[in-house]
Amino acid sequence: YKKLLANNIRIDMITSLDESAFLGSMQFDDESLSKISKDTIILSGNMTNEGVLKKFNQENLFLFELYKSFNKDNKYFTGYSIGEVTLDMLLDFKPKNIYLIGLDLALNQETGDSHAKDSDSITSSLNLDEEQSRDTFSHVDSVIKVKGNFRDFVFTTPLFYSSISSTNDKLSKKEKNINVYNLSSHGAYFENSIPIKKEEINTQDFKDINFNDINILPFLIKHSIKELSEESKKEIKNEITFLENDILKQLKEISKKDYKDFSFLFKDIIEIPLMINNSSYKSFFQILIGKLQIVIPYLFYHFNDIKVKNEEKKVKKIRDVFVKQITNLVNDYIICLKRVL
């Protein structure tokens, strides 16, 4: 947004979602915020650092929910970066045309930089000429080749690739009468988007928008709440009860059992995500599955070895570690739920 300010472009709305405290001094420093109009609306993710939120005009600050809705029947948004989360929101507003500027999700194809030098994001720089080895793969240092918006291909990072996949997923579900134009010269191509150069845009066709007549602020106020409804609080309390009475109880039962081999332990382990998935409380399911997808393949790989020794002893140790880790995970999640109440 600082680049817009530097070019005397009025900013009517800013979106943010990063939970990092350093944003208060890096992206939203006092000098830059002083240049923003008092009428600028801030849409900020509910995971944003509290210190950052306090710097905004509280009358124009609205929080949106990410990944899970604590407000019953509320809309939540998803994505790996503010870019595709904002796109997710814009698509929900159902505009006729969306123009993507700066959503490159690729490295600078000349310098290898992840972000513009004058941006306030943490910038990394990779050597695009270096031969890539697939013996090791890093989400920070590895480079991936993908289709470019205006080039045959561009280089990107694993983290950006996740955002590209997320963006493609959102655009695949957009309504057909919404046109999404991508102006990125260095960036990745997005499915269901239209590559366009700035010279090809006829700005004479654009209409002046009088935001005073649209009344965005009253609209947002009308469709916002300042606290959880009693029904939402009841849902959260019921989820806590389910986790305490069912999941923690199941973990305790596992801790008491003796397992001769890993296959029997696995049957009891997998029962836990099945219990959650069959309930009305799906959020913790994704957390648990993410954990198991990392761990379980390695355990199967080990115990499928016919030469494995002391299986019963190893399984006992795995049982104890699993119960301890998942119990801690459940308890931490319960603490987070109670904070919302």
Predicted features, each with a name:
Residues 2-96, 297-341:
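Acidic/Gly/His-enriched mid-domain segments of enzyme catalytic cores or analogous surface patches
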Residues 15-24, 28-39, 115-137, 199-210:
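Acidic, Ser/Thr-rich peripheral helices and adjacent loops at domain boundaries
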Residues 58-74, 116-154:
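Active-site gating loop/helix substructures
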Residues 80, 157-165, 241, 320, ...:
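Electropositive phosphate-/nucleotide-binding environments in soluble metabolic enzymes
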Residues 131-187:
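Polyanion-binding loop/helix "lid" in catalytic or ligand-binding cores
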Residues 171-341:
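Long, compositionally biased charged/polar accessory segments in the mid-to-C-terminal portions
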